[in-house]
Amino acid sequence: MEAAMRRYAELGVHTLKTGYAGGFKGGYLHHSQYGVQHYQRVVETVAKYRIMLDVHKPIKETGIRRTWPNMMTREGARGMEWNAWSEGNSAEYLTTQPFVRMLSGPMDYTPGIFDIDYSTAKADKGRIEWNGPNAECCIKTTLARQIANWVIIYSPLQMAADLIENYEGHPAFRFFRDFDADCDWSKALQGEIGDYIVVARRAKDRHFLGAGTDEKARTLVQKLDFLEPGVTYTATIYADAPDAGRNPEAYLIGKRAVTARDTIRIEMAERGGQAITFIPAEK
C-alpha cells in the first residue's frame, strides 16, 4: 500500500475512491478487528501523501474524519448502484436517509443519474445481465429529484455518476456546473421522516436548495429567508414537469429574481423533487 500511494502522489493523484464489494481475503468482515485496522491504516497512509479518500463499503462513521480530514466522504448505505440490479431504492428511502444515515456524516450516494429508465443501457446488450433478464430495472425518482439529491444528500465530494453520453448537451447538466459541494453552511428547512425533505446549503456567496418527496406528489411553501438580506439572486429552478409522475425524465428549467423576502412554491411529482441555485445577480 505504501508504495502504491507514493506512486499515486508522484503522478499527481489527489483523490482515491476505494471499494470492497468483493470483501476481504480470508473472509474477514468489514467491521471485524482486521477490517477496522485495515481502514485505519488506509486513512493514515494516504494522509502522508496528501490524498483525499472516498470510501465505498466502509465501516460505520466514528468521527475519524475530524482527526483525519482527508477522510472526505463515504457511502455507508444502500447506494445508487442498487437500482441497476434489484428492486432499487425507493423515493421513501431517499427521504429517510437524511434523518438517519446522514446524522453520522457525509454520504457518497452518487446521485445525478439522467438515464432514469436505463434506455441507454437497454440498447447495450452487454448490460442486460446486470440490468435484469428483461432490463426492467430503473431509477425510482424523477430527473429533477436526481439533481435535488446533490443538495439533499450532503457530500463535500460529489460525483456525476451517469454515462458521459447521458450528460452531453443536456440542459440540466448546468446545475452540476453551478453547484459547489464545498458548503460552509447547511440547514434543514422542513421535512418529515420518510415523507419529504427540504434542505438549503451555502458555498461562498451561492446558495442551493434541494427538495424531495416520497411516492406522493406534494406542493410545499418555502420562505427564502436563509438568503443574504439585501442581495438579489438569480434563482435557476430545476423542477418536475407536470407529467413527471408518468414520465420521470420530464423536467422544467425556470429563472426568476428573488430576495430573502420572497416565498416560493415547490411543486413535486410523485417520487419527485426540485433543485434551485441562487447566484447573486450581476449589478
Regions found by a protein language model. Give the residues of each.
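Generic beta-strand/beta-sheet core signal
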Residues: 16-21, 54-56, 210-214, 238, ...
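C-terminal beta-strand-rich structural cap/linker in extracellular carbohydrate-active enzymes
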Residues: 255-283
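Conserved, mostly hydrophobic/aromatic
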Residues: 53, 152, 209, 271
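Solvent-exposed beta-hairpin/edge-strand motifs
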Residues: 227-241
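Aromatic- and carboxylate-enriched substrate-binding clefts and catalytic-loop regions
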Residues: 1-137
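Solvent-exposed beta-strand/loop surfaces of large extracellular or lumenal domains
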Residues: 237-261
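Carbohydrate-binding surface patches
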Residues: 192-229, 274-275
